Amino acid sequence: MKILYSQRRFYHVETLFNGTLALSGRDQETTGFAWWAGNARLINLSGKLLGAHVAHAGLIVFWAGAMNLFEVAHFVPEKPMYEQGLILLPHLATLGWGVGPGGEVIDTFPYFVSGVLHLISSAVLGFGGIYHALIGPETLEESFPFFGYVWKDKNKMTTILGIHLILLGAGAFLLVFKALYFGGIYDTWAPGGGDVRKITNLTLSPGVIFGYLLKSPFGGEGWIVSVDNLEDIIGGHVWLGSICIFGGIWHILTKPFAWARRALVWSGEAYLSYSLGAIAVFGFIACCFVWFNNTAYPSEFYGPTGPEASQAQAFTFLVRDQRLGANVGSAQGPTGLGKYLMRSPTGEIIFGGETMRFWDLRAPWLEPLRGPNGLDLSKLKKDIQPWQERRSAEYMTHAPLGSLNSVGGVATEINAVNYVSPRSWLATSHFVLGFFFFVGHLWHAGRARAAAAGFEKGIDRDFEPVLSMTPLN
């Protein structure tokens, strides 16, 4: 059996639907690609590749719709979302659907509608995917030149890039319109413990919006993850949507400059590597966002952040012991520092004990008790509201800790419940997937650069076990 490595050889693919029963184009000799590199058979078959992409979109949307309906079917309104292992309903609730003051679910019908709409959409996409994969033209260049392309055609590639950017910009504006005009979105900072509201006075100042990008990613700075109000989030989407749309128009109307033509590799595998790299970055950022940010991901739906649960514990015991007569302002802990309250490195009054490391935390249930110099002692003595006590006790017992077998909470805690926070799931999954995508980026970037340099070989398959096995048929 002759082993073929080069990508530059066999492109013609016959399928069952082209009027012949010969199954060529499925094996290594006729295509130059082994079974596990099946997608590579579609490199120059734009029609079939379109089918693969549309079918893939159908699978994604089907999962969204089916999982959405599954969560609706299992949802218990009396329990918080984060106790029920939900990951889709919290996103819908954050967008302001079906919830009222304090994040209480008042109507699950919008969630049902969302699931059904996704299922119907997935059927349309699935049909389109199967049609283009099996029945439609193998290549689009001849019959539909607008949708056809050659990977090396730099002008066409940047036009496609432009169209994608415009679609992304439109997506960003969908959130803006929902927040401004279509009922508003859930604001965890609304007075009295959160509510749905329309976002009226957006932050459009470039100094504020782009200032986030200039922040340090560490500690109390937190780069863009430190955003703590919806005005900045929606204003940021206005900026981002506008940049994407104008950038898209720019890329459609212009051809790549000489420096870009020289610097970049212009092949299908190179574009794949660029995309994987971008998605890896998004995955890592999303991981940090869902783990630390309780404005974009309200704790009412996703459970408290780690720092929030820790500070909630300190607050809960401060309330208890103060009721029992402790003077929380002067009580000394076992280390000689304040037992309940101490000073931060910059002089603010903060919670004492182990939670001192989380003194940066800002949370809606805690902020009303701060004054100009951190926590206000007189407010802690006179102004603590019952809703703040209830919420902190709830958050204290729902820290985003837990193991794969769903035994949640601190490992040594005797009252641990069968609970793992959606924050743990979402942060971990996005980190792990982001890492996998990053490895894929390195792999495909290396192959694309090697191919461009003219020595692309792929994996040396001379000693692959499957080659010495008897054929399956």
Swiss-Prot record:
Positions where N-acetylthreonine occurs in the chain: T15
Recorded coiled-coil stretches: none
Compartmental location: Plastid, Chloroplast thylakoid membrane
Cofactor binding note of this UniProt entry: Binds multiple chlorophylls and provides some of the ligands for the Ca-4Mn-5O cluster of the oxygen-evolving complex. It may also provide a ligand for a Cl- that is required for oxygen evolution. PSII binds additional chlorophylls, carotenoids and specific lipids.
InterPro entries on file: PS_antenna-like, PS_II_antenna-like_sf, PSII_PsbC, PSII_PsbC_sf
MF GO annotations: chlorophyll binding; electron transporter, transferring electrons within the cyclic electron transport pathway of photosynthesis activity; metal ion binding
Positions with a binding annotation for [CaMn4O5] cluster: E367
Name by which UniProt lists this protein: Photosystem II CP43 reaction center protein
Gene it is expressed from: psbC
